[in-house]
Amino acid sequence: MSTLNTRERTGAGLAGGSVLLVGGSVAASSMLTGYPVLGGQAVRYLAAGLLLAAWARLTHKPLPRPTGPEWAWLAGLAVIGLAGCSVLMIQATRVADPASVGVIIGAAPLVIIIAAAIAARRLPAGRVLLAAAVVTAGSAASQLGGATGPAFSAAGLAWSAGALAGAVGTSLLAAPLLPRLGALAVTVYACGLAGLLLLAAAAIARTAGGPPILAIPTPAQLAALAYLTVAVTAVVFIAWYGAMERLGVDRTGLFNGLIPITSLAAVALTGTGTITPLGLLAALAVLAGVILGLGRHRKSLPAPGRGHELSSASSTWMVRRDGNLPDSVMVSNSQ
């Protein structure tokens, strides 16, 4: 196994930092149980998009204008990966304990690698597939090792599976956009679209007798919304997409398995739970799987290079100038 080069080490650092921030979102989300879901998530994404757009303007970072087909991909990313995934995740935690949700979401590394391989019409790299299986098993074991263990229910399983599908959709739908638009532009446009969609949905729900679109947040809710907006949305999306550009789908996706581990650590640090011996062993297994998958190998799905072009909204993969198909996609948790 070869050592990582500078570019790959940067990608690993970006992915690892993203996981730490997302792990902290569990505590933040628990503070929003009494806050309007659709309106709150709309504010989160709109604010994140505006903050990043302002930052791009101040730093003179270009935001390329999307083409028609790219707008279609961005709309799908906003609906499925951002708005859909976040709302489904919240609904899952309302009807199921975090452990059971974590078991399902922990399968993300394995699902994304298999999905990417199927879409690219090739077999996944053997070592990365093995690493993904180790990460998935360790992630599930970390939840099984909790104080109470997961309590599965039909509703909880359905919501969790939907959230997992949304997370995988985030990867598959973002991949064709990154080479030309870049991580910053993709995040700005997708957050803006997701925020507008959620705001419209909140307004429709309100006219149908649903909850208010927004409410005056308590100090704790305001802090939670700020953390989710800045750290878990604006920072995480750019960092994760940057990691994917450097590591590729298979190796970046492995870091998703660390999210339940960081969540358990956050719970232990805040004194709201404990880590059992099984949970600790599971954490070590996940770490071993990530290290195994990070090693270079010939059959790794490559990160996208410049020179790709998106020919139509129905094209799942972009073709490089040399005629080869890039297979790089990623999965992001947008809790």
Label for each model-derived stretch:
Residues 1-43, 48-50, 87, 91, ...:
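Glycine-/small-residue-enriched transmembrane alpha-helix faces in small-molecule transporters
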Residues 9-14, 39-55, 76, 130-137, ...:
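Hydrophobic alpha-helical transmembrane segments of multi-pass integral membrane proteins
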Residues 15-19, 42-43, 82, 86, ...:
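Helix-helix packing/entry segments at the starts of transmembrane helices
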Residues 21-26, 53-105, 141, 229-247:
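Specific transmembrane alpha-helical segments of multi-pass solute transporters/efflux pumps
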Residues 27-35, 94, 143-154, 205-220, ...:
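Membrane-interface helix termini and inter-helical loops of multi-pass transporters
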Residues 32, 40, 44, 92, ...:
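Hydrophobic/aromatic residues within transmembrane alpha-helices
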Residues 39-50, 81, 89-123, 127, ...:
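Specific alpha-helical transmembrane segments that line the substrate/conduction pathway
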Residues 52, 115, 124-146, 257-258, ...:
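Hydrophobic transmembrane alpha-helices of multi-pass small-molecule transport proteins
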